[in-house]
């Protein structure tokens, strides 16, 4: 299954709030049905599927990519669900978004793909590149790169930055201070349901 490229607001309404997918503010719809107040019974498979889709759409992953991350998380020490979130949060594209350098994760991915980002003085064009404590993320010394990202920073750095990251406004560079903790994940998700969804595939 390929990465979703359709209307983002439509997707957000379906699985729930996904702050990394769009910077738009949703308007409530009068015909929206809240499952918590509906009498219709929802299967456990449906619940797990929707949590999985929420996670996949938020981080902009293909089905194959998410399954790969789940398999890696299962082999690691600790809670599989929390390790999975940690792997996704420490991706380069998500880190750029959380630093306020891009309005959305898709926007951050585009910055990386177009070569606007350097990491530890090396140009990185792989959005899935995994971050580690001590990594320094900078903007390439090009007028186009610095102008574009400076504009994003002015607009989106008002949002609360997670404690595992920091940003130097003077030098226009971000730092990864430590591995992300569960409470710093900016997504309402039950990661255990995602792990359960993939239980027969890993």
UniProtKB/Swiss-Prot annotation:
UniProt xrefs under InterPro entries: Ribosomal_uS4 (IPR022801), Ribosomal_uS4_bac-type (IPR005709), Ribosomal_uS4_CS (IPR018079), Ribosomal_uS4_N (IPR001912), S4_RNA-bd (IPR002942), S4_RNA-bd_sf (IPR036986)
Question: Per its UniProt record, what Pfam families does this chain match?
Answer: Ribosomal_S4, S4
Alphabetically, which GO biological process terms does the record hold? Answer: ribosomal small subunit biogenesis; translation
Please state every residue range assigned to the domain named S4 RNA-binding. 90-153
Q: Which residue ranges does the record annotate as region Disordered?
A: 13-37
Any one GO MF term held by the record is: structural constituent of ribosome
Looking at the record's lineage, which domain of life comes first? Eukaryota
From the record, give the cysteines joined by S-S bonds: none
- Tell me the SUPFAM superfamilies matching this sequence: Alpha-L RNA-binding motif
Q: Where is the composition biased (Polar residues)?
A: 20-37
HAMAP family per record: Ribosomal_uS4_B (MF_01306_B)
Tell me which family the UniProt entry assigns to this protein. Belongs to the universal ribosomal protein uS4 family.
Quote the function comment for this protein.
Answer: One of the primary rRNA binding proteins, it binds directly to 16S rRNA where it nucleates assembly of the body of the 30S subunit.
Record text on subunit structure and interactions = Part of the 30S ribosomal subunit. Contacts protein S5. The interaction surface between S4 and S5 is involved in control of translational fidelity.
Report the PANTHER family cross-referenced here.
30S 40S RIBOSOMAL PROTEIN, SMALL RIBOSOMAL SUBUNIT PROTEIN US4M
Any idea what this protein is called?
Small ribosomal subunit protein uS4c
Q: Which organism is it from?
A: Takakia lepidozioides
């Amino acid at each position: 299954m390929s990465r979703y490229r359709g209307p983002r607001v439509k997707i957000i309404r379906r699985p729930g709030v996904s702050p990394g997918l769009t910077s738009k503010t949703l308007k409530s719809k009068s015909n929206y049905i809240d499952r918590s107040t509906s009498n219709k019974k929802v299967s456990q498979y449906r619940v797990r599927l929707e949590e999985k889709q929420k996670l996949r759409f938020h981080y902009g992953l293909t089905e194959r990519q998410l399954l790969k991350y789940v398999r890696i998380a299962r082999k690691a020490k600790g809670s599989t669900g929390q390790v999975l979130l940690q792997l996704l949060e420490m991706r380069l594209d998500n880190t750029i978004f959380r630093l306020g350098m891009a309005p959305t994760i898709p926007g951050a991915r585009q910055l990386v793909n177009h070569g606007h980002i350097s990491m530890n003085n090396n140009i990185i064009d792989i959005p899935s590149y995994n971050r580690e404590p001590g990594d320094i993320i900078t903007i390439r010394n090009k007028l186009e790169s610095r102008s574009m990202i400076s504009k994003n920073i002015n607009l989106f750095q008002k949002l609360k930055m997670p404690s595992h990251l920091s940003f130097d406004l003077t030098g226009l560079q971000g730092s990864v201070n430590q591995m992300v903790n569960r409470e710093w994940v900016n997504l309402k998700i039950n990661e255990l349901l995602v792990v359960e969804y993939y239980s027969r595939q890993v």
